[in-house]
Design a protein with these regions (language model features):
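Short, surface-exposed beta-strand-loop junctions and turns on beta-sheet-rich folds
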Residues: 133, 157-159, 183
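A short hydrophobic beta-strand segment most commonly corresponding to one strand
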Residues: 139-144, 165-167, 181-196
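Conserved short histidine dyad/triad with adjacent acidic residue
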Residues: 116-134
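Asparagine-centered strand-capping/turn motif at beta-strand->loop junctions
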Residues: 176-180
Length: 196
């Protein structure tokens, strides 16, 4: 794997699988809101009608999630990865600072499914591909909030510091390792093609 520090991005029309779009973004106010609302972590598990992908046979991951916009389905047997339904969670209103940063970077783009993911020290999220038709028309991004981590996608790998905004090709195998000395928190979000 090669270490990359790439810039600029279009709607996936290139050979790179990871692109660093910006570094040094001030995420202090985001961290303050996360500390103010600790009860928001994993709150989506208690929402009426909510079902985990683990319940549907997908591998469990060593992460906690604080989802602001989740995918929805019309029928219980439908696969959320093939659904275009996006639903704001109750925690959405608590986390305005992250949305301000995204709006500053992407102007009038629609933010679709999004949330914070935490990963304990030395833990790994193994290689996986985000499955379903939903992902075919969207770009996926990370904005690193806390901790230092190694991120890999395809044959590329980068070391990510807090305040780093990156795009990656989630149609390729990708994953991460927390190489820092604190829990890694990143904000993962989707923007439709043509808006990023």
């Amino acid at each position: 794997m090669s270490i990359s520090t790439m810039t600029s991005m279009t709607d996936g029309g290139c050979d790179q699988s990871i692109k660093i779009l910006k570094t040094g973004i001030n995420v202090k106010k985001v961290v303050e809101q996360l500390k103010k609302y600790p009860q928001d972590w994993d709150h989506q598990k208690t929402l009426e009608g909510s079902q985990s992908l683990v319940d549907r046979g997908f591998d469990d991951l060593p992460v906690s999630a604080l989802q602001l916009i989740i995918g929805g389905v019309k029928h219980k047997e439908d696969f959320v990865g093939d659904s275009e339904i996006n639903i704001k969670t109750p925690a959405y209103a608590h986390h305005s600072e992250i949305r301000k940063i995204i709006r500053k970077q992407f102007k009038n783009a629609d933010i679709h499914r999004c949330g914070f993911l935490s990963l304990p020290v030395d833990e790994i999220v193994g290689a996986h591909i985000d499955e379903g038709t939903y992902y075919l028309s969207r770009n996926r991004y990370h904005l690193s909030i806390l901790g230092r981590y190694q991120y890999f996608c395809g044959k590329e790998t980068v070391i990510v510091e807090p305040g780093t905004l990156l795009w990656f090709n989630n149609k390729l195998p990708h994953g991460t390792v927390n190489i820092g000395d604190e829990t890694r928190i990143t904000f993962v979000f989707d923007i439709p093609h043509g808006q990023s």
